[in-house]
Swiss-Prot record:
Signal peptide: none annotated. Belongs to the LpxB family. Keywords: Glycosyltransferase, Lipid A biosynthesis, Lipid biosynthesis, Lipid metabolism, Transferase. NCBIfam families: lpxB. GO terms for biological process: lipid A biosynthetic process. This is Lipid-A-disaccharide synthase. InterPro entries: Glyco_trans_19.
Length: 389
C-alpha cells in the first residue's frame, strides 16, 4: 500500500565502512519504494553519500577500534551523538535507522524510541558471540531489528524483539562463481602462478599492530614459494600512505598495491591472509582459502577474551559453527606461523575443494535480496506507525 503523501524524513547512522556498505544497499531498496521527495540524512560514508545521503557528520569520527583507543575519542563521539539527538528530537524524523555501530546507535535509539520515533537497527550485534548482556539494551532501544544472519531472528524474538532476517548484501553482490582470471587481468597480475592477497586492515592502529608482521610473513612465503605474487588493496589514499613505509622497507617483494577494491584483489588470489572483520565474509563468499588473524592492544584483548562465548572470531568459522579456516591471533600471530598456515591453505587442493563446498552453501543461505527485504521491513514499520491510508 502507498504511504501517506506527507514528506518522509529518514535519519540514518553508519559508523564505519562495513556499515556504509550495508546502508548504501538499503538506500537502493528504499529509493525504489519511497517517494522521490524522501530525505535521507544523518551520519554516513562515501557509498551512502554517492546515493544522495546528506551526511551531517563525517563517518570517520565514529570509526575507532578497541576499548583503550576509543577512550581518547569519547568526548568528541558523545558530543556528536548529543548534537544529533538534539536535532532529531527537535525535528522528529519518520523513522531512525541505526546501521551497525551498536555502542553509538543504541544510546541514540533509546531516547528516540522513548520520544515515539520508530527505531530500526540494521545488523544485530554479535550477542551470540560475546557481550550477551546487550540484549537488554536492544529491548529498550529497538523497535525492529534487521538481521543479516539467519540464526539471529529466533534469538531476538525470545527476548521480545521484533526481527526480520534479510540476508547479507555481500551475498547478493558477489557472484556464486568468482572470475579469478578476469580479476587478474584487470589488476595486471599473471594468468598463472600462485597469488596471495594480503589485507592487514584499514585503520592506523591495525596497520601499526599487525602490518609489520604481515610483511615479514610475506618475506618468508617468498623464500618458501619463490614464484608467489602478492596483492594488497589500499582502500583510501590515507591507507596507502600508512602502508608506504612498509612497502618501501620490503621493496623486494613482488607486491601489487591496488587502489581500493579489496574484493577484486581477493578474487584474483588463490589464498588470502586477512585481518578479522567483515572482509573475511567477503573472502568466504569468493570461495577462497584463508588465514584469519588480528592483533589488538593487550588490555583490549583481555577484555575481548573474557567477554567472548565462542572459540572463534572469524565469520566463516562462526557461520559454519566450527573451524573451517585457521585463526592465528594476538601473540600467536608470528610471521612464521602466518606464513606456514597461509602456504598450507595455498597448496592443499583437497582442502580447497572442501572449502568451496562449504562456502557455496553459506552463500546460498545468505543470498536473500537484502536491499529489497530490508527496505520492505523499513516501509512496513513506517506504515504501521503512521497508519495505512
Amino acid at each position: 500500500m502507498p504511504l501517506p503523501t506527507s514528506p518522509l524524513r529518514l535519519a540514518m547512522v553508519a559508523g564505519e565502512p562495513s556499515g556504509d556498505l550495508l546502508a548504501a544497499s538499503m538506500l537502493d531498496g528504499l529509493a525504489a519504494r519511497l517517494p522521490d521527495t524522501t530525505q535521507y540524512f544523518g551520519i554516513g560514508g562515501p557509498r551512502m553519500i554517492a546515493k544522495g545521503f546528506d551526511a551531517h557528520f563525517a563517518m570517520e569520527k565514529l570509526s575507532v577500534r578497541g576499548y583503550v583507543e576509543a577512550l581518547k575519542h569519547v568526548p568528541e563521539i558523545l558530543g556528536i551523538r548529543n548534537e544529533l539527538k538534539r536535532q532529531l528530537l527537535a525535528e522528529p524524523p519518520s523513522a531512525f535507522i541505526g546501521v551497525d555501530a551498536p555502542d553509538f546507535n543504541f544510546g541514540l535509539e533509546h531516547p528516540l524510541r522513548d520520544a515515539g520515533i520508530p527505531t530500526i537497527h540494521f545488523v544485530c550485534p554479535s550477542i551470540w558471540a560475546w557481550r550477551g548482556g546487550r540484549i537488554k539494551k536492544i529491548v529498550k532501544a529497538v523497535d525492529h531489528m534487521l538481521c543479516v544472519f539467519p540464526f539471529e531472528k529466533a534469538l531476538l524474538e525470545k527476548s521480545g524483539v521484533t526481527a526480520t532476517y534479510v540476508g547479507h548484501p555481500l551475498a547478493d553482490e558477489i557472484p556464486l562463481e568468482p572470475d579469478t582470471a578476469g580479476a587478474r587481468l584487470e589488476l595486471g597480475l599473471p594468468e598463472s602462478g600462485p597469488v596471495i592477497a594480503v589485507l592487514p586492515g584499514s585503520r592506523r592502529s591495525e596497520i601499526a599492530l599487525i602490518g609489520p608482521t604481515f610483511f615479514d610473513a610475506m618475506e618468508l612465503m617468498l623464500q618458501r614459494e619463490p614464484g608467489v605474487r602478492f596483492v594488497m588493496p589500499a582502500a583510501t589514499p590515507a591507507l596507502r600512505e600508512l602502508l608506504k613505509p612498509l612497502v618501501d622497507a620490503h621493496a623486494n617483494l613482488p607486491l601489487t598495491l591496488t587502489d581500493g577494491n579489496a574484493q577484486r584483489a581477493m578474487t584474483a588470489a588463490d589464498a588470502i591472509l586477512v585481518k578479522s572483520g567483515t572482509v573475511t565474509l567477503e573472502a568466504a563468499l569468493l570461495k577462497k582459502p584463508m588465514v584469519i588473524s588480528y592483533k589488538v592492544p593487550w588490555l583490549t584483548g583481555q577484555i575481548m577474551r573474557r567477554q567472548g562465548y565462542l572459540p572463534y572470531v572469524g565469520l566463516p568459522n562462526i557461520l559454519a559453527g566450527r573451524f573451517v579456516v585457521p585463526e592465528i591471533l594476538q601473540h600467536f600471530a608470528t610471521p612464521e606461523a602466518l606464513a606456514d598456515a597461509t602456504l598450507t591453505q595455498l597448496r592443499d587442493d583437497a582442502n580447497r575443494r572442501t572449502l568451496t563446498e562449504i562456502f557455496t552453501e553459506m552463500h546460498h543461505v545468505l543470498k536473500q535480496n537484502t536491499a529489497q527485504r530490508a527496505a520492505e521491513a523499513v516501509v512496513g514499520v513506517i506504515e504501521a506507525r503512521r497508519g495505512r491510508p
